[in-house]
């Protein structure tokens, strides 16, 4: 039996707390695990706690609706236009967004792990291709179009209503003049990248070029084997180049924004994505003046980013997760009531 990286980290954290982590049934499944300590028991699904409701998970997964609700409660959320299966990607709302910002991001409204997300979309032809790809990957064929926000991808981990860690996630960008295939091969030579077939505690994963990158490149009119042309910036969404711990550099009010977003959506264990200049996160949200914004709340929050950063201090997020799920003394109480 081989646990995934996430479950290996959960099991190690449980052991460190004197608890047990064991399979739920006779046949191995990586999706469920039983935690126990004395009379305390909890069944978890990766980093989903036993207190998460289906309503809260579904609400958080709907990026457009959850953002609308959070914005109505005063949180600094990015704007966006929802295009459903009958909507026109070239409609006036999207055209106005493109004219006003010049660069857009297109993503599945119910997306996960950055799959189907196209950044740096600058023209209508690319916009249409990005729409088609995102729609095909979305649960309800819905596409979210939003402005491209320059700056840093900041992920904040929230456990039991408390923001416990923050990390800058640097995405790989393909360089001009070399093929995507060659550049991905070079990236995969990094010993810090592990494989899905043999899970380890490597902080990053191998990039499967044929699995998702080929379709991603088609959005920009590019191919895996062809050199990246001048003037084109292609970010490999959903992958990491570096993960830098920023917990001690983020202003407490931004951490409070992340915790509030989770609380309002009923998400007790979440990863909140913020984006903007790193300098904006050093001060309170009011001082950022729209330069930094909240993008989304993720229900399966990739806690390994904080436990295994490539730079900076590792944070004990899995110990906090286990303690919360088992409701050990000192852990925050369950908080999975939708409050918007």
Q: At which residue positions do the language-model features occur?
A:
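Active-site nucleotide/adenylate-binding loops and adjacent lid/helix of ATP-dependent enzymes
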Residues: 42-47, 53-201, 252-255
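C-terminal active-site "lid" helix and adjoining low-complexity regulatory extension at the edge
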Residues: 235-249, 263-269, 276-340
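A short beta-strand motif that forms the metal-chelation/ATP-contact edge
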Residues: 32-42, 154-159, 163-165, 280-305
């Amino acid at each position: 039996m081989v646990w995934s990286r996430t479950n290996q980290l959960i099991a190690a954290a449980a052991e460190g707390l004197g608890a047990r982590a064991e399979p739920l049934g006779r046949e191995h499944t990586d999706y469920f695990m039983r935690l126990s300590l004395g009379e305390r028991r909890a069944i978890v699904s990766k980093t989903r706690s036993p207190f998460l409701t289906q309503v809260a998970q579904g609400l958080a997964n709907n990026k457009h609706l959850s953002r609308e609700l959070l914005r109505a409660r005063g949180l600094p959320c990015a704007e966006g236009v929802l295009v459903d299966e009958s909507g026109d990607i070239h409609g006036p709302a999207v055209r106005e967004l493109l004219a006003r910002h010049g660069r857009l991001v297109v993503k599945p409204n119910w997306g996960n792990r950055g799959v189907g997300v196209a950044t740096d979309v600058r023209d209508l032809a690319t916009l249409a291709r990005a729409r088609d790809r995102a729609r095909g990957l979305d649960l309800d064929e819905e596409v979210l179009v939003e402005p491209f926000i320059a700056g840093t991808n900041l992920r904040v981990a929230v456990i039991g209503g408390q923001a416990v860690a923050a990390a800058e996630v640097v995405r790989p960008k393909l360089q001009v003049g070399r093929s995507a295939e060659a550049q991905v091969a070079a990236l995969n030579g990094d010993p810090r990248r592990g494989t899905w077939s043999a899970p380890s505690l490597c902080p990053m994963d191998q990039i499967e070029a044929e699995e998702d990158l080929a379709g991603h490149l088609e959005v920009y009119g590019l191919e895996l084997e062809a050199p990246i042309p001048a003037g084109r910036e292609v970010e490999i969404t959903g992958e990491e180049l570096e993960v830098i711990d920023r917990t001690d550099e983020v202003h407490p009010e931004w951490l409070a924004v992340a915790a509030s977003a989770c609380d309002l959506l009923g998400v007790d264990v979440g990863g909140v994505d913020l984006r903007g200049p790193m300098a904006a996160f050093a001060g309170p949200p009011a001082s950022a003046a729209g330069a930094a914004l909240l993008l989304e709340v993720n229900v399966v929050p990739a806690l390994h980013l904080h436990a295994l950063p490539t730079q900076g201090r590792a944070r004990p997020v899995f110990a906090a997760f286990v303690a919360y799920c088992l409701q050990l003394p000192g852990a925050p109480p369950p908080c999975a009531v939708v409050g918007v």
